[in-house]
Amino acid sequence: MGRTDSMPEAHGLNKLIRPLRYHEQSRQWFAILFVPLVSYFGQPRRELLIAGSVIAIIGALIRLWASGHVKKNKVLATDGPYAYVRHPLYVGNILILLGFSMASNLWWAYALMVFLILFYYPPAISYEDAKLNKIFGEEWQNWSKNIHALIPSFSGKAGSTSSEWSFKQSLFKNGEPVIVLYLIGFMYLLVTKL
């Protein structure tokens, strides 16, 4: 079953665009291609490169942290970064996009970043929330009342699950350490342009 199967039938341009907005691999590939694109064309300035690098590193660390906690569709992750935000992997992605936009010093990188975020993340969040609600029901509802989708909540009202962070899971289930190396490589390309 596809992500758009339960939606009302679309017409016109929406019929063409909606499958792309809800297609997970499209979102991932656009983000993966964004990094080398802005790195290749980047015209970094030292202070923006430093600030952008710090933001991108924070984003990558959030993704690394989150991926070591999530047990997709098996256990509702409510600890680690999930104690603060429902979609920490998306928060990490957004920070990585922002960091590379800043580090590249390209005006159009910001415009492309905003487009990617607004085009892909609202439907992805809506879909994920509906799916988790269907799988975990009341447990998800109780947890999501206190935890925002993207803005950290420091209410101290995390869910009931508790799991230790796992590097093995982060590496083999999500490939996060490989993604970190990928990001470091392209950030280095920007550094060489100073």
What function would you assign to each model-found segment?
Residues 1-79, 94-194:
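Membrane-anchoring alpha-helices and their flanking helix-loop junctions
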